[in-house]
């Protein structure tokens, strides 16, 4: 596999992990939980640390 494919697999795995963690941290309706988990998973390098910080308070 090329470097690009390794990076793509890493991004997809981290997106899935961020999706699952965000899903279990949120306490809203299922639609809102799915939407927030999907958006955080898709943009995890910027939004996942923010979601973790918000879950602390």
From Swiss-Prot:
Disulfide bonds: none annotated. The chain crosses the membrane at residues 6-26, 34-54. Keywords: Cell inner membrane, Cell membrane, Membrane, Stress response, Transmembrane, Transmembrane helix. Its main location: membrane. It is a multi-pass membrane protein. One of its GO terms (biological process) is autolysis. Induction: By conditions that induce the stringent response such as increased expression of RelA, heat shock at 43 degrees Celsius, probably under control of sigma factor E and/or H (rpoE, rpoH), or growth in the presence of trimethoprim (TMP), mupirocin or serine hydroxamate. Changing residue 1 to T: Not toxic as no protein is produced. One of its GO terms (cellular component) is plasma membrane. Acts as an orphan toxin which is important for maintaining cell fitness during stress related to the stringent response (decreased amino acid, purine and thymidine availability). Overexpression inhibits cell growth and increases the formation of persister cells. Causes 99.9% of cells to undergo bacterial lysis within 2 hours after induction; nucleoids condense, the cytoplasm seems empty and the periplasmic space enlarges. The intracellular ATP level decreases about 27-fold suggesting the membrane potential may be disrupted. This is Orphan toxin OrtT. It comes from Escherichia coli (strain K12). The lineage of its organism: Bacteria, Pseudomonadati, Pseudomonadota, Gammaproteobacteria, Enterobacterales.
């Amino acid at each position: 596999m090329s470097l690009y494919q390794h990076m793509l697999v890493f991004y997809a795995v981290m997106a899935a992990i961020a999706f699952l963690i965000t899903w279990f941290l949120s306490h809203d309706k299922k639609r809102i939980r799915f939407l927030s988990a999907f958006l955080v998973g898709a943009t995890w390098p910027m939004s996942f640390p923010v979601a973790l910080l918000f879950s602390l308070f």
